[in-house]
Amino acid sequence: MPKWIRSTLNHIIPRRPFICSFNSFLLLKNVSHAKLSFSMSSRGFRSNNFIQAQLKHPSILSKEDLDLLSDSDDWEEPDCIQLETEKQEKKIITDIHKEDPVDKKPMRDKNVMNFINKDSPLSWNDMFKPSIIQPPQLISENSFDQSSQKKSRSTGFKNPLRPALKKESSFDELQNNSISQERSLEMINENEKKKMQFGEKIAVLTQRPSFTELQNDQDDSNLNPHNGVKVKIPICLSKEQESIIKLAENGHNIFYTGSAGTGKSILLREMIKVLKGIYGRENVAVTASTGLAACNIGGITIHSFAGIGLGKGDADKLYKKVRRSRKHLRRWENIGALVVDEISMLDAELLDKLDFIARKIRKNHQPFGGIQLIFCGDFFQLPPVSKDPNRPTKFAFESKAWKEGVKMTIMLQKVFRQRGDVKFIDMLNRMRLGNIDDETEREFKKLSRPLPDDEIIPAELYSTRMEVERANNSRLSKLPGQVHIFNAIDGGALEDEELKERLLQNFLAPKELHLKVGAQVMMVKNLDATLVNGSLGKVIEFMDPETYFCYEALTNDPSMPPEKLETWAENPSKLKAAMEREQSDGEESAVASRKSSVKEGFAKSDIGEPVSPLDSSVFDFMKRVKTDDEVVLENIKRKEQLMQTIHQNSAGKRRLPLVRFKASDMSTRMVLVEPEDWAIEDENEKPLVSRVQLPLMLAWSLSIHKSQGQTLPKVKVDLRRVFEKGQAYVALSRAVSREGLQVLNFDRTRIKAHQKVIDFYLTLSSAESAYKQLEADEQVKKRKLDYAPGPKYKAKSKSKSNSPAPISATTQSNNGIAAMLQRHSRKRFQLKKESNSNQVHSLVSDEPRGQDTEDHILE
């Protein structure tokens, strides 16, 4: 079956006109019962066998349609999410028909735009031009809020009013004709796409070991195995993981932990989905103690969420700082749940400060102001960084807030990461507890052999920043091409130079940054929702902002006429004016002015370098269009020439790195990285120290601290300068297997575990026992509700002496003994019969306190 038809099946067909062969049109119409119209046209067509079809009414295929199509030998059912509710169907249809009140064109609604592949070189308006055949794109899972979907997913819409379809006798004939004709018209050939010029290799440090690199010969479509169809890989939680999910659904504050590879991060992602379904997407704060860990779960650092900066100062000072920020104040007021990953690196003092802030802002004396808490991490891994070497480390579980608020502490026991390598699991568990025997030491020393040289570059982990910098600089020197040096601009009101230099070291942005084309880099600042501290990417080119402005406009609309580029190339002032209009949109003047001054100051900090031509790989997005039209080919060539001219006009200007970043979901994003500013402020928000620099650092090698929470298929670890408890365990447990692990300078005397952590872990319970306790508590609660007092309600006394139950309201009005019975319900009573009084009923207690007790009935 033609790929175009396959990609259309069991999805909404676009309302705009589309081009297909006549046979494909008949096949689609017969199978889908879609109300289609068509017109014969020769413009842009090679023969009259091709028609322009248009959907009169949006249509969705049912399961019966899919069953019919699956009879074909060539049919491959796409493994992708289906719409399930009529409400969603109506919403999508509404979005398709929605028109902009100004230009009367369909609005670029988020759900509608999901029909268009984000990496497509065509614009929205060009997707359905008569001269272009562009198949409708699949709907990705992220197109819809999963919280609004049913838990039991079907394979498609079921319409009970429409009978199952009968197979047409000409089905095979139509199918074969469609294959031959559709292939001749495919605009994008998946097998012949231009390779992305993205350097040789990149070790992507993500939580998903199946996608571990970006290669020069691998485009985005190859990241999914089914020819462009995004495959939904189902997450199957273990029984203990499901038990923890149920505890969270019941509103409990939870801390769960486990050894490396027990699926803590996977469970956390599923729990976040559940919590967002309960509280709403905007009311669940997803955070982590480090930027890289936050990147893995799609969140931000706890410091960034809370609005406390570095968290220095007493709790009241930080509270006042949060109060001054409307954004952070609103966050604290509205959230229903707070998720913190890698809680082990958060110290007790900071956790108590956050608890104080939450209670004060929310005016609620419950722990964290009544916010549901979900903590995850492993205290056997890296401890909090001690600010004062003379003060002992205090873990988060030692804080007052933890003891008051976190009642469910659970240990995960099933290992997934090193599953199948029982020996490796045992070695890691011994290292975790600091209990290394002779055999374990021998096994780790065997791993000093070099790793096989294949396509995947091993990530290198070191214990100190100096070692990381040395390794990264060595890798950079091996790359060909010119080195671009970016010097930071430091400032601030602090006069003590020694203290100032020490504070500047807290910034992740380096004082001097060396980059080349092909360098692997990491973002060190949160810029937006998808580009955060910890995002990894590769430098593919250097260009000035003016050139990038033209380049971005061309990538957004490859069909842009060359005349527009000619105007900008011949008249740079018009280009600058267009840039200023673009940058000022949506920004307050003060903010825009500050950003402009930062960039200008950084640009003046270096002399312009000689301009080298843009690499041809930058224009690969235009070469993906397969066409024999000489006019189109000439336009593409002309646009490349104009871009080179605009680039050459940038002589004397600072050129910035153009980086292709890789997200945790394997999508890519091209960004011209511009300078950012960092500052440490006093109580009046006056900068004590500040730095302006590109928010990048080289990332072939990482410190062990930054690697916590990562899964690395190939990793090289040097333990020569390990200095912290848990540091060696974190580094070695990043590996998936011994085959992908190289260990240098292993020393068993450096493998230690903290005694406080060992004692704390002895108090943890299993997920199964915690859930059983929850069920028992619910039964007790239900029993209490069943026996709760009320009008005309007969309750059994809880007193073991069979004391009377609370008396009904009618009796209370006639008998003054009711108040006394309620005050002393747990004491023994003996009441004598009284004449001329209303009848009073009392039930016999089912919990006798002694054998000599008697049942008493009030009458």
Swiss-Prot record:
Belongs to the helicase family. PIF1 subfamily. Residues 727-746 bind DNA. Phosphorylated. Undergoes RAD53-dependent phosphorylation in response to loss of mtDNA. InterPro entries: DNA_helicase_pif1-like_DEAD, P-loop_NTPase, Pif1-like_2B_dom, PIF1_helicase, PIF1_RRM3_pfh1. It holds the Pfam family Pif1_2B_dom. Optimum pH is 7.5-9.5. The keyword Isomerase applies. The keyword Isomerase applies. DNA-dependent ATPase and 5'-3' DNA helicase required for the maintenance of both mitochondrial and nuclear genome stability. Efficiently unwinds G-quadruplex (G4) DNA structures and forked RNA-DNA hybrids. Appears to move along DNA in single nucleotide or base pair steps, powered by hydrolysis of 1 molecule of ATP. Processes at an unwinding rate of about 75 bp/s. Resolves G4 structures, preventing replication pausing and double-strand breaks (DSBs) at G4 motifs. Involved in the maintenance of telomeric DNA. The gene is PIF1. This is ATP-dependent DNA helicase PIF1. GO terms for biological process: chromosome organization; DNA recombination; DNA replication; double-strand break repair via break-induced replication; mitochondrial genome maintenance; negative regulation of telomere maintenance via telomerase; replication fork reversal; telomere maintenance. Residues 844-859 have a biased composition (Basic and acidic residues). Its cofactor is Mg(2+); Mn(2+). It comes from Saccharomyces cerevisiae (strain ATCC 204508 / S288c) (Baker's yeast). Residues 142-178, 782-859 are annotated as: Disordered. Disulfide bonds: none annotated.
